[in-house]
Amino acid sequence: VLYNSYAKNRGVAAVTLTVENGCFSYDGRHTVLSDISFCASPGEIVAILGKNGSGKTTLLKCSVGLLKWSGGHSFLDGRDVLHIKSRELWSKISYVPQAKSSFGGYTVLDSVLLGFGSSIGIFGKTQKSDVEKALSVLRRLNIENLSYKKCSDLSGG
């Protein structure tokens, strides 16, 4: 979700993530992703659907520069993510991967608040307004009812 309400209130610009002709292979022979293109603009909700092992996580990692595309590029507001310094990149986007063991004790709301980390800072304290904004995101996604449910109690799919 490229949700811009929180960003605007923190003085951070909302961003557009674009992938053009993304291709990826772990071993150079077996293609995992082929010719993937999309544009996610601020305020849009983008769903990536696929079977287990189909490359959804790989797509996200390539999209934000955690893995390098074998072919194609990812752009954040028109700039190749591989040419953006890490500090600047992570001040504009958040990536919260699925990791049930890591999030076992956290609620869904807690995990959404983790995405606010670059604005709050490592030693910063979550404010009431942060919680309200996170709940607003969950409400927008129509999953506010899961806010206080433990992530370990949710389905991985």
Q: Each PLM stretch: what is its role?
A:
Residues 64:
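Helix-to-loop junction immediately C-terminal to a conserved catalytic motif
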Residues 72-80, 89:
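Conserved ABC transporter NBD signature motif
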Residues 17, 32-35:
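Conserved structural motif at the start of ABC-family nucleotide-binding domains
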Residues 49-51:
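The feature captures the beta-strand-to-loop junction immediately N-terminal to the Walker
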Residues 17-28, 74:
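Conserved beta1/A-loop at the N-terminus of ABC ATPase nucleotide-binding domains
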Residues 149-154:
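Conserved ABC ATPase signature
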Residues 128-146:
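Conserved ABC ATPase "signature" region
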